[in-house]
Each structure stands twice: as structure tokens, then as C-alpha cells.
Regions:
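Short linker/helix segments within small regulatory modules
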Residues: 111-124
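Surface-exposed, charge/polar-rich loops and edge strands
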Residues: 90, 128, 152-156
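Short cysteine-rich clusters marking metal-coordination/redox-active sites
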Residues: 94-97, 127-130
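Short cysteine/histidine-rich zinc-coordinating motifs and their immediately flanking basic loops
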Residues: 106-112, 139-149
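Short metal-coordination and nucleic-acid-contact micro-motifs, chiefly zinc-binding Cys/His arrays
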Residues: 87-91, 120-123
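Long, charged N-terminal interaction/targeting segments
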Residues: 1-89
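Short functional micro-motifs and their immediate structural scaffolds
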Residues: 99-105, 135
Length: 156
């Protein structure tokens, strides 16, 4: 299922991407009308805390999920409960722009990443849209730990 987080849910959008959900997050220039248009045109489930936006979406028959808490962990647990994730998609999307990541040969990154990272890591991914590079460093391990914690809480 494709998702759309409104402006108030930026951290949630990032984490949903980490969990592999196709998650649109609007840029700062987009207004409510633009957000609703994307949700409708791309058949996305609108996630929002904004009651007025949710009401407009309902009138347009756009599927919605109201997020009632500001706590990120609770938000993620709600989504995991309502829309179970596909574990094969974990850590496959760019956290910045939502594009699917691609494996890139280590040799192509020789002068594009810090030397220490190049020497200590073997597997790299890149985003073809924003050109960000990813590898299994400390951020990766922290994300995996949080994924496992949330997943285990969801299953219990």
C-alpha cells in the first residue's frame, strides 16, 4: 500500500521508508490541495493529525488513517498493526526521497565516500534520484535494532 504523510509527520515518513513502505512526503511548497491531489492521483493512504485535512480527504473519498499521537514509536506501532510490513523491503528505500536503492560496486565509490568507510565496508547502495550513499555502518545497525524492537512489540 502506498502512503502519504502530511507536513506534520516527517519523522514518521522517514521511518516508514526505513520499513520499506512507499511513502510520499510533501515538500514545503505543497498546500493541502496539492497533498490531496497527490493522494488521489497516486491512490495513497493519507496519514495525518490534521482534522481539517482528514475531513477534506474523506469528502473526496481518499482513504485516511488519523494519527492521534505525537509519539513516533506509537505512530509506528499503529501503522505496523494496521498495515503489516513486508520484511523483504526493510531498508530498501532512500530515507530522503523514497526512491528504491540500488546496489553499487564498491570500486565506483573510491573517491566519493570517506576513506575509512571505503576501507571498512564492502556493500553499498545508492539512490539514483538524490545520489545519497548507504552502507551497513552504525546508523544501519541502530535502524535494524529499532526495526527489530518495533517488530517484536508489534508481534506480541
Amino acid at each position: 500500500m502506498n502512503l502519504l504523510c502530511d507536513h506534520m509527520l516527517g519523522s514518521l515518513a522517514t521511518w516508514l521508508r526505513i520499513f520499506g513502505y512507499d511513502t510520499f512526503y510533501p515538500n514545503e511548497m505543497m498546500n493541502d490541495k496539492d497533498i490531496l491531489q497527490v493522494a488521489r492521483n497516486e491512490k495513497r493512504l493519507l496519514l495525518s493529525r490534521d482534522h481539517a485535512l482528514l475531513l477534506q480527504a474523506k469528502k473526496l473519498l481518499i482513504p485516511i488513517l488519523e494519527i492521534q499521537t505525537t509519539d513516533l514509536t506509537e505512530q509506528l506501532q499503529l501503522i505496523l498493526q494496521k498495515i503489516p510490513p513486508n520484511e523483504t523491503l526493510f531498508l530498501t528505500r532512500c530515507t530522503l526521497c523514497n526512491t528504491l536503492l540500488h546496489l553499487v560496486p564498491k570500486e565506483e565509490l573510491k573517491n566519493k565516500i570517506p576513506e575509512k568507510i571505503y576501507q571498512t565496508q564492502d556493500t553499498f547502495w545508492t539512490c539514483s534520484t538524490c545520489k545519497k550513499y548507504y552502507w551497513m555502518g552504525t546508523h544501519y545497525h541502530h535502524m535494524k535494532k529499532r526495526i527489530n524492537t518495533l517488530r517484536n512489540n508489534h508481534l506480541s
